[in-house]
């Protein structure tokens, strides 16, 4: 027998036949969702694009294509009851604890607008938003009333000590409905960690990336992002499933 170098006998490893399409889909999703890491992209590929791929393969392609993995956010402090007790009020089921908060942004003419965000702490779903130049306590009540009709009444609602939330009108109205109010310590936004996390994602993924020329445009884009957050965006705390999978919308158009 003729001697032959072992190096010439090595099997040439060819990339899978679907590698090109998978790479294309990963790049498309990474472009659309600039703050998502490869694990969330993997979840989107499997949930929405019909792939059955593990995160290690996606990570390999991710790094080969020079895509940047976003830095992890620091862990937030624990949430405590505002009576100073050492028992953390954890949401244990849907509608157990809601929380709400305000955000501020501007249109291109420099005028400020406010965003009221309301979430279910257990499901992580954003239940509703209000986007206006100015939001009064009565408008907060009106939005909560709308959500109570549609979703039912929560047992608790958590907020900071902003005047819109501590106003007598809203506190009395909630008390009449049997909703217990939880107020965080002043200057301690981490105690309202669930809604602060949501607000941070909206800031990163939308507000810091968009320019709003009018209030109407801001309303449309913010509501569009809310629906995508609820119905499409994989959430790590929910096993990389969206907060409201029962209303999931397909990303793939036919």
At which residue positions do the language-model features occur?
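Short, surface-exposed connector motifs at secondary-structure boundaries
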Residues: 37, 125-127, 151-156
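Basic, flexible linker segments flanking DNA-binding modules
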Residues: 2-97, 188, 242-251
């Amino acid at each position: 027998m003729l001697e032959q170098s072992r190096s010439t006998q090595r099997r040439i490893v060819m990339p899978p036949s679907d590698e090109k399409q998978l790479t294309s889909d990963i790049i498309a999703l990474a472009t659309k969702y600039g703050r998502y890491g490869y694990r969330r992209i993997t979840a989107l590929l499997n949930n929405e694009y019909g792939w059955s791929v593990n995160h290690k393969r996606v990570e390999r392609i991710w790094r080969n294509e020079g895509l940047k993995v976003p830095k992890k956010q620091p862990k937030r402090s624990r949430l405590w009851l505002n009576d100073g007790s050492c028992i953390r009020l954890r949401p244990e089921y849907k509608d157990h604890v809601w929380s709400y908060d305000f955000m501020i942004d501007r249109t291109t003419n420099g005028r400020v607008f406010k965003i009221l965000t309301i979430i279910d702490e257990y499901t992580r779903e954003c239940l509703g938003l209000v986007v206006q130049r100015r939001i009064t306590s009565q408008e907060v009540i009106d939005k909560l009333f709308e959500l109570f009709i549609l979703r039912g009444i929560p047992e608790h609602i958590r907020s900071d000590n902003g005047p819109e939330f501590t106003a007598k009108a809203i506190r009395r109205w909630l008390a009449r409905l049997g909703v217990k109010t939880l107020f965080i310590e002043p200057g301690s936004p981490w105690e309202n960690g669930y809604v602060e996390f949501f607000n941070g994602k909206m800031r990163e993924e939308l507000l810091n990336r968009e320019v709003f020329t009018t209030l109407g445009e801001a309303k449309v884009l913010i509501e569009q992002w809310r629906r995508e957050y609820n119905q499409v965006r994989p959430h790590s705390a929910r096993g990389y499933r969206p907060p409201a999978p029962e209303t999931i919308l397909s990303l793939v158009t036919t």
